[in-house]
């Protein structure tokens, strides 16, 4: 009886630790600036950084924006639907147009974090990211 109880408690502890680790391993966006563009009715610019822990990838998504990416540190793999994936290093850039589906967005390294700067021109008040579907 005690052995079964201990095994169950151990399994629950492992499951909780795994779930906490999985939650911690996500990209993290930090907004830097959001500014209306008065010369472009209904448009705004947003600038943010996105951090990718080692080995982390985001699910396919859309931005519905002109999206410019600049790699600050580490290496990332980016791909829009219909194009080949590209691996980018610090100082390199990537562009998505408003109709693109961002099929791949991941840290190229399983051991080191990566960080990018993202500059978007989008419809004012619209979410920066939404699921691809």
Please give the residue ranges for each predicted region.
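Short beta-strand His + acidic residue motifs that chelate non-heme Fe in jelly-roll/DSBH
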Residues: 60, 78-79, 96, 102-109
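Glycine- and acidic-residue-biased ligand/ion/polar-headgroup-sensing regions
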Residues: 65-82, 90-92
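Short acidic-glycine-tyrosine-enriched beta hairpin
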Residues: 37-41, 52-53, 82-99
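N-terminal targeting signals for Sec/Tat export/insertion, comprising classic cleavable signal peptides
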Residues: 33-65
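Ligand-binding loop in jelly-roll beta-barrel domains
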Residues: 85, 100-125
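A short, N-terminal "cap"/entry segment at the start of jelly-roll beta-barrel domains
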Residues: 2-46, 79, 94-95, 113, ...
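Extracytoplasmic
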Residues: 42-47, 66, 83, 99, ...
């Amino acid at each position: 009886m005690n052995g079964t109880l201990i095994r169950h408690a151990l399994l629950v502890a492992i499951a909780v630790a795994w779930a906490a680790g999985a939650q911690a391993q996500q990209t993290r966006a930090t907004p830097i600036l959001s500014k209306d563009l008065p010369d472009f009715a209904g448009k705004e610019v947003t600038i943010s950084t996105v951090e990718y822990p080692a080995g982390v990838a985001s699910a396919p998504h859309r931005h519905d924006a002109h999206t410019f990416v600049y790699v600050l540190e580490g290496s990332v793999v980016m791909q829009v639907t219909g194009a080949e994936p590209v691996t980018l290093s610090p100082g390199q850039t990537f562009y998505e147009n408003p109709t693109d589906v961002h099929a791949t967005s991941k840290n190229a390294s399983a051991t080191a974090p990566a960080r990018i700067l993202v500059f978007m021109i989008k419809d004012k008040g619209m979410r920066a990211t939404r699921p691809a579907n």
